[in-house]
Amino acid sequence: MNRNRIYDIVQKGSVSILIFGTVGGTVLLGQSYYSHRQRRLAALQEFQQREKIKEEGFAEDEFNQLALK
């Protein structure tokens, strides 16, 4: 094997590793973003439900106070 052939193999291997790493990193980043987005949406829905329950409770308290007067 001459030196140029060795360099060619190393270069092709490096390029393959670089492409594989880039694609793999992109996939992992996409999965991470998607799971983060799902957690944020779930937290937002939970927050909205809590706020709705608070508002309903506040309206009930107000009604009860008016009924007592």
Curated annotation (Swiss-Prot):
The keyword Transmembrane applies. The chain crosses the membrane at residues 13-35. It is a single-pass membrane protein. The keyword Protease does not apply. GO terms for cellular component: mitochondrial inner membrane. InterPro entries: COX14. Keywords: Membrane, Transmembrane, Transmembrane helix. It is found in: Membrane. Its main location: membrane. GO terms for biological process: mitochondrial cytochrome c oxidase assembly. This is Uncharacterized membrane protein C757.15. It comes from Schizosaccharomyces pombe (strain 972 / ATCC 24843) (Fission yeast).
